[in-house]
C-alpha cells in the first residue's frame, strides 16, 4: 500500500506525508514480514504574521519492519526494528543558523530500536510462555535559545533496555470457576546523558527498575473476578512499591455489563522528557530542574461502569456510563523559584500536597449497514488538595484548579458508506474552557488565562476506483477544523511566551490524498 496526502495548513502552508507498507507471507504461513516507511515534510506556520512560528517546520523519516517465524506448531519468534529521523524547528528566521535568530527551539533526533519476542504454547494451549526483550538508542542535538545566544546548543543520548518473562496458565476450574493465572518478571534500564553547557545544566541519570507481577482472573459468562499486584524496585527510591489491582464484572443479562475496578500506580522521582525541554519566555528561556527532595507520586483509582448492548432490528447500539475517582499523593507540580545568573527563569519540579480527579464518562455507539456513529463526553473535576503557588507574582493567588484540565470535553466519529465505493467521515472534538498559565514577557506580568471552549470539526470524503482485480486507487479530500476553532491570542515578537499555546493543533486546513492498495 502506498499513500500520499497534502494538507494546506491555514490554507497556505504545505504538510506532505507519504507512507509505504507491505506484508509478505510464505505459502505455508510459517514466516511473514511487514515493512513500513514514512516521509513527512511540514512547512512552518505563522498564524498572526509576526515572523514567529506557531507551528514549527518538521522533517521526519521512518523505516522499519516487523517479522515472525513459526519455529514449530506451538512456538513463534517475533522480531522488530525501526529507525526514526526527525528534525523540528520553530521560532523566527528559520533559514539562518539558530544562534543568529531572536528565538529558536530546534531538535534533531536519530532513533534506532528493536525487539525480540518468543512465544511457546503447550499442546492444549493451557500453558503459555512469553520471553521478550527490546532496546532503543536515541541521539538528540538541540538548540533552545533566545537573543542570538551562541551557547544554547545541547546534546542528549538515551539508551533504554527492557527484558522480561511472562507465564500464563488456563485453569479448567480454580476453586469455583474457570480462571487464568498470569505471572512474570521484568527488568528495565535507562541511561540518560543530557548536556546544555551554556545553561550550566548537565543531567546524568541511570535508572534500574526490577519488577515482578502476578494476577488471577476467574471468569465465566456471568461473572469475572480479577485480583493481582505488581512489585517495583526503582534504584532512585529506597523502598519497594507494591501496586495492587482488582476488578469485578457482573452480567445480569446478556445485554448489560456491570464493572467495578481498583488500581494503583506511581511515578518515580526522575527526569522525564518534558523536563529536558527549554521554553523561550520574555527574551530569555525557562529551565526546569528537579528538586533534590522530590518523592514519588502515588495514585489510587476506582471506577464503576454500566455497559449496555442491544440490537434493534438491523441497528446495533452500545451505551456506557462510567464514574471514576483518582487520588494523587505527592503530586508533581512545577513552580517558579527565581532566576539564574544569566536571568533565565528557573522552574522546579517538586511535590505538591496531593490532588483529586473525578468525573463521569458517557459513550455511545450505533452501527447500521451503511453508517457507524460513536460519541463520548466527559465531565471531570481536577483539583489540588491545597492551593498551589506557581508564580512569584504576588498578584496571583495560589490555585487549586489544575491547569490545562477542562471540566468538560468530548468527541464523536462517524462513517457513512451510502454507495459501494464512496465513504464520508465526519469527526469532531470538543474542549471546554480551562485555565492556562501565561508567563510575563510579551505581557507585563504572569497571569492565569481562562480560555474559551473549542469545537474542532473535520470532514473527509473518499472514493475507491478499481484499477485491476487486485489493485484499487483511492482518492480523498477534506477539511480539518471546518469552523476554524483556533487560538486567537498568541504572544508576538521576541518576548513571547513560547509555551502559551492551547486548543486545536491547527487552524482550518484543506487536504487531498491518494492511496494505492495491492
Where are these regions (language model features)?
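Transmembrane beta-barrel strands of outer-membrane/channel proteins
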Residues: 6-10, 35-41, 79-83, 131-137, ...
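Surface-exposed extracellular loop regions of Gram-negative outer-membrane beta-barrel proteins
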Residues: 28-47, 130-145, 180-188, 195, ...
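Membrane-embedded beta-barrel scaffold of Gram-negative outer-membrane proteins
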Residues: 29, 35, 128-144, 259, ...
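Structural signature of Gram-negative outer-membrane beta-barrels, strongest in the C-terminal barrel
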Residues: 72, 176-180, 186, 200-327, ...
Amino acid at each position: 500500500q502506498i499513500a500520499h496526502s497534502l494538507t494546506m495548513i491555514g490554507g497556505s502552508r504545505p504538510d506532505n506525508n507519504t507512507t509505504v507498507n507491505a506484508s509478505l507471507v510464505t505459502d505455508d504461513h510459517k514466516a511473514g514480514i511487514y515493512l513500513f516507511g514514512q516521509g513527512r515534510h511540514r512547512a512552518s506556520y505563522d498564524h498572526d504574521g509576526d515572523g514567529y512560528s506557531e507551528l514549527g517546520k518538521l522533517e521526519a523519516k521512518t523505516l522499519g519492519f516487523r517479522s515472525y517465524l513459526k519455529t514449530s506448531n506451538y512456538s513463534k519468534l517475533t522480531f522488530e526494528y525501526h529507525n526514526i529521523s526527525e528534525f523540528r524547528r520553530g521560532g523566527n528566521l528559520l533559514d539562518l543558523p539558530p544562534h543568529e535568530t531572536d528565538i529558536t527551539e530546534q531538535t534533531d533526533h536519530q532513533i534506532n530500536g528493536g525487539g525480540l519476542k518468543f512465544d511457546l504454547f503447550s499442546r492444549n494451549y493451557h500453558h503459555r510462555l512469553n520471553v521478550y526483550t527490546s532496546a532503543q538508542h536515541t541521539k538528540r542535538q538541540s538548540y533552545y535559545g533566545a537573543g542570538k545566544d551562541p551557547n544554547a546548543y545541547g546534546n542528549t543520548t538515551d539508551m533504554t533496555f527492557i527484558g522480561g518473562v511472562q507465564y500464563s496458565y488456563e485453569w479448567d476450574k480454580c476453586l469455583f470457576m474457570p480462571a487464568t493465572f498470569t505471572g512474570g518478571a521484568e527488568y528495565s534500564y535507562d541511561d540518560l546523558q543530557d548536556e546544555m553547557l551554556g545553561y550550566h545544566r548537565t543531567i546524568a541519570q541511570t535508572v534500574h527498575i526490577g519488577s515482578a507481577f502476578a494476577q488471577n482472573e476467574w471468569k465465566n459468562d456471568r461473572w469475572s473476578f480479577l485480583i493481582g499486584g505488581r512489585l517495583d524496585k526503582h534504584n532512585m527510591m529506597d523502598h519497594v512499591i507494591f501496586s495492587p489491582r482488582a476488578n469485578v464484572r457482573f452480567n445480569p443479562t446478556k445485554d448489560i455489563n456491570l464493572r467495578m475496578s481498583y488500581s494503583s500506580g506511581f511515578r518515580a522521582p526522575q527526569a522525564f522528557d518534558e523536563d529536558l525541554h527549554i521554553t523561550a519566555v520574555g527574551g530569555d528561556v525557562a529551565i526546569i530542574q528537579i528538586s533534590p527532595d522530590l518523592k514519588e507520586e502515588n495514585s489510587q483509582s476506582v471506577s464503576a461502569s454500566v455497559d449496555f448492548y442491544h440490537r434493534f432490528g438491523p441497528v446495533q447500539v452500545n451505551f456506557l456510563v462510567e464514574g471514576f475517582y483518582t487520588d494523587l499523593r505527592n503530586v508533581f507540580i512545577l513552580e517558579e523559584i527565581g532566576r539564574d545568573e544569566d536571568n533565565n527563569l528557573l522552574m522546579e519540579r517538586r511535590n505538591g500536597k496531593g490532588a483529586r480527579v473525578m468525573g463521569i464518562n458517557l459513550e455511545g455507539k450505533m452501527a447500521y449497514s451503511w453508517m457507524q456513529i460513536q460519541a463520548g463526553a466527559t465531565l471531570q473535576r481536577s483539583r489540588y488538595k491545597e492551593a498551589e503557588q506557581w508564580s512569584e507574582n504576588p498578584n496571583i493567588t495560589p490555585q487549586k484548579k489544575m491547569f490545562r484540565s477542562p471540566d468538560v470535553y468530548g468527541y464523536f466519529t462517524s462513517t457513512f458508506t451510502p454507495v459501494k465505493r464512496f465513504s464520508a467521515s465526519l469527526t469532531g472534538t470538543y474542549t471546554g474552557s480551562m485555565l492556562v498559565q501565561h508567563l510575563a514577557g510579551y505581557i507585563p506580568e504572569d497571569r492565569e488565562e481562562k480560555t474559551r471552549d473549542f469545537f474542532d470539526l473535520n470532514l473527509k470524503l473518499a472514493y475507491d476506483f478499481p484499477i485491476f482485480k487486485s489493485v484499487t486507487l483511492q482518492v480523498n479530500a477534506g477539511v480539518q477544523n471546518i469552523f476554524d476553532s483556533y487560538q486567537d491570542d498568541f504572544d508576538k515578537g521576541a518576548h513571547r511566551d513560547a509555551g502559551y499555546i492551547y486548543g486545536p493543533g491547527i487552524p482550518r486546513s484543506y487536504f487531498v490524498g491518494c492511496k494505492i492498495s495491492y
